[in-house]
A protein has these predicted regions:
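H-loop (His-switch) and adjacent beta-strand-loop-beta switch element
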Residues: 139-155
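A short acidic/small-residue loop/turn micro-motif
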Residues: 157-159
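ABC family nucleotide-binding domain
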Residues: 1-138, 142
């Protein structure tokens, strides 16, 4: 059996999390929020952590906001910071729990495109839980679960 420390290290290495509500720490800048998982894992130097945090924020169009705190951003921007934070330790799997549940339609589309890019550009596996039928229709694979039981397993047909 793994120790608590080993389980924590495995989570930090293998999984990134995006929640319905961003759970960014309000007293910290965007840079500091994105740096937190890297600091917890302890794999990179301080300079490498700050460089990676800056690169991730820039990749999501938030580079100029890096010194701001979350309350200075829109809901969609905060959720993009949450996605950047989920990628901080470059995990192979991103778990997204209702990632667009608290967003307007424009921000929902932007966050969905980010999640899609995580798969197509970054080669990540994204496991998303959503009640948004339109969002679910765009996923490569959909598992429809009702009362804890798998009701349907559908795969999107990609034409060559």
């Amino acid at each position: 059996a793994m120790s608590e420390g080993e389980r924590t290290r495995a989570r930090l290495t293998l999984l990134g999390f995006v929640f319905q509500f961003h759970f960014l720490l309000p007293e910290f800048s965007l840079m500091e929020n994105v740096a937190l998982p890297m600091r917890a894992l302890g794999r990179l130097s301080d300079r490498e952590i700050l460089t990676r945090a800056e690169q991730l924020l820039a990749a999501f169009g938030l580079g100029e906001h890096r010194r701001k705190t979350p309350d200075q951003l829109s809901g969609g921007q905060r959720q993009r910071v949450a996605v950047a934070r989920a990628l901080a330790n470059d995990p192979p799997v991103i778990l997204a729990d209702e990632p667009t549940g608290s967003l307007d339609s424009i921000s929902t589309r932007q966050v969905f495109e980010l999640l899609r890019d995580l798969v197509t550009v970054y080669g990540k596996t994204v496991v998303a839980v959503t009640h948004d039928v339109e969002l679910a229709k765009q996923m490569h694979r959909r598992l429809h679960i009702v009362d804890g039981a798998l009701e349907k397993d559908e795969r999107m047909v990609v034409e060559a």
